[in-house]
Every structure is written in C-alpha cells, then in structure tokens.
Design a protein with these regions (language model features):
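Short, basic/aromatic recognition patches
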Residues: 9-37
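Charged, gly/pro-rich active-site loop segments
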Residues: 1-20, 94-173
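Short amphipathic alpha-helical segments and helix-helix/interface helices
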Residues: 26-27, 72, 115
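A short, polar/charged loop/turn motif at coil->beta-strand junctions and beta-hairpin connectors
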Residues: 29-32, 92, 141
Length: 173
C-alpha cells in the first residue's frame, strides 16, 4: 500500500477553518469511482484527455487500453500522466487528482488479480482472459497500466472548501 510521506492543506485555496482531507477519504473516492479521466502527453507535447474505467488498488490506479489507442501510444513515448475523478456538483464534493507515471503491468499473477477486480467492479462486460502479458476479450487485446502516485491533490467544495496535497516517496529509476 502506497502511503503519503506528507499531507498539507494549501491555505491559498482553502477556507480559513478548513482541515486537510484524510488520505482514507481520498482513497475512498478513488476506489468507489466508476469513471475516471486520464491526461497523457502526445509525442508533439499536446495533451490528450479521455474518460476511462479503472481500479484504485494497493495505492495505485490501474487501467487497461488497446495498444493502438492514443493514450497507450502516448505512454510508450512519455509515461507522465494525470488521473482524476470526483463529481460535477459545484456546491459539494471531493475531487481527486493523481499525478504519476504509467508503467505497463506484464506479470501474470498481477494481471490475473486485476482481471478479477475489473470483473468484480464492472461486471461481465469487462471479463478478461490473461495471456501474452495482456488482457484479452472479444474486443481484442488490452494492455494494463499502473500509475503509482507522485503527488495527489484533493479539492473539497462546499461551505468549507479546501485543497489538500499528498506527496509520495520518489520511485527509483
């Protein structure tokens, strides 16, 4: 489980009586979300944003995509990405932004675990077989990626808005 090394409320963007959002609350939003958005960087440095399904598991965000899709092509060139989720209600809610690097998951045991988690969360439409270091289903092959957080931001809206920042240990390499 990835745990933050620091938690900080940014007073510039928070009510004077706001408190930092707990990491547990942030993880709950990430885990319970059904739709996420991912931003990747194209070869020419233009951003690419798209909705997708995914999992928050063991302190990382996991998703799958076809190897020919734009986000997969972008990640091969530049692994930097941002994943976000939340709600679209101005008066209340908690939005979470995860900044990190996407790494391809190829280990069979991990892929089998993730395939089961996708099935549990999203149902039979997202049932995958694992072979050749990827997910497979009638729609074709899907590569699986994992985004371990470098930084996470939480944005609370409502009567006591606040912005919390969580920082994580730099990954080796």
């Amino acid at each position: 489980m990835t745990e933050p090394v620091s938690t900080e409320l940014d007073s510039r963007f928070s009510a004077s009586d706001a408190k930092p959002t707990s990491w547990e609350d942030a993880q709950r939003v990430l885990s319970d979300a059904r739709i996420y958005w991912i931003t990747t960087v194209r070869h020419d440095l233009r951003p690419h944003v798209t909705p997708l399904i995914g999992l928050w598991i063991d302190g990382s965000f996991c998703f799958c995509t076809g190897p020919g899709e734009q986000k997969a092509k972008n990640i091969v060139d530049n692994s930097n990405c941002v994943v976000l989720t939340g709600c679209n209600i101005y008066e209340a809610g908690l939005d979470i932004v995860v900044e990190g690097h996407a790494e391809r998951v190829v280990e069979e045991a991990r892929l089998l675990t993730l395939a089961e988690q996708f099935l549990t969360k999203y149902g039979d439409e997202w049932r995958f077989e694992v072979r050749e270091s990827a997910f497979h289903h009638e729609g074709g092959e899907a590569w699986v990626f994992e985004v371990a957080p470098d930084k996470v931001l939480g944005f609370v809206r409502g009567d006591r808005p606040g912005q919390t920042r969580w920082l994580f240990e730099p990954r080796p390499g």
